[in-house]
Every structure is written in C-alpha cells, then in structure tokens.
Amino acid sequence: MSSSNYNINNGGDYYPLSSSNLNSTSAITNATVMEYSTMPSSSPGSMSSSPAYPAAYQAPSPCYVADPNQLYYQQQLAHNGNDMLVQAHAQAYQAQCFAWFQQQYSQLSPSSFPHPMVAHHAGFIPPPPSFLHHQHQQHPRAPSEKRRGARTPFSDSQLYALRTRFEQCDTIKVDERRKLGAVIGLSPEQIKIWFQNRRFKLRKEKYKQIKQDAVQQQKSAKEEAEEDQKHVIS
C-alpha cells in the first residue's frame, strides 16, 4: 500500500490523508453511510417528494448508499490506477449498478415516466409522434437557411431560344419574358433566373481569364528579364 491515501468529505471531494490516520478512514466512511441512510425524503436532492416520479425512482439503490469497501477501493484506484484488482472491483461495482437500474426501469410502464424521452432511453420505447412533432416545432429553420429548389431541366429547343436571345442582349424585360415564356413553355421567373445565372457564369469566366492572363504576363516578363540578364553576363 502506498504512503498516502484519499478520503471523501461530506461534499463528495477527495482530500489527502496520511498513512498514520488510516484507521480513522473507516469511521468517517461509516458516518457518511449513516448520514446518507438516515437522510429524510424531503431533502432537496430527493426525488420522492415529487409526485411526478414513479415508485421505482424511490426504491433503494446500491449505487446511492456508500459502501465502505467501495469507497476504499475508489481511493486506491484514484491513487494507483494500474492495480488490476482495484480496477476489477470497480468494474464489478459498475455492473451491479447497471443491473439494478435495468431491473427497476423494466418494471415500469411508459405512462409512469415524467417525460417521454426518459421512457425511451430506459426501456427502448419509441416516443409518441406528437412529442417528436413538438420537438421539431421548438427548433424551426433559421431564416438564413434557405431551402434550395430543384433545378429546372431545359430542353434543347428551350436552351437554343434562351442562348439566342442572350447573345442579342444579356438583359430581358418583364413583357419580353412573358412572350418568350409563352413560346418556349417556361414561366417568366424561370427565364429571369436563367438570365441571372448566365450573366454570373460569364462574369466568373471573364474574371478567371483575366487572372490567368495576368499570371502569364508576369511569367513572360520574368523570363524576358532572365534572358536579358544572361545576355548582359555573356
């Protein structure tokens, strides 16, 4: 055993305890157990005072009452995490707690839970559709999140008419959009969006071409400067 251990105060915090005072650890632990065992049900942390919680929440749990041996092994585990015996004891204690919770929750009906999602997580019972719909209404779509509509498939004849008109002028008025739409079978809004996208595409291609030309000019100027420098040296 190491030269120092840890003890637990009433607040649940760990503080160091010297090896000379190890005999007082069990006395403090027993006092803690008695304090939790005799705690009245009307305490702020007790759920038995709330009528919304079923009887299974009020049943005694091996995880709520502190065990002196368990507290001792927790102290040893916090001080020496490589001890296989201490780790095995802690894992067995966790399995015991899980088995108790599973047994208590399996005996309850879905209507006895204070909240639908508690029953869903405890007994793997799907929540009612009304609850899911209510949860969806509490988180509406943000104004910035715009839903994108489906792309309109254009036929070859429609694209030919649109491109021919765009080559004449990249803008089109409302009256002309209506007339053209009646001929090729498109709405004025669809024609407007197509012209906007076409103008944006051309501007993007033009900017890309200008950037490529600038890079090419810089490269050509650098090559010419290097050639001139070679001629001067020679």
Curated annotation (Swiss-Prot):
InterPro entries assigned to the protein according to its UniProt record, in alphabetical order: Distal-less_Homeobox_TF (IPR050460), HD (IPR001356), Homeodomain-like_sf (IPR009057)
Phenotypic effect of disruption: RNAi-mediated knockdown on an hlh-1 mutant background causes embryos to become paralyzed and arrested at the 2-fold stage.
Compositionally biased residues, Basic and acidic residues: 220-234
The UniProt record lists the keyword Thylakoid: no
Main location: nucleus
Record region (Disordered): 128-154, 209-234
DNA-binding region ranges: 147-206
Tree of life domain: Eukaryota
Protein name: Homeobox protein ceh-51
The organism of origin for this protein: Caenorhabditis elegans
Gene this chain is encoded by: ceh-51
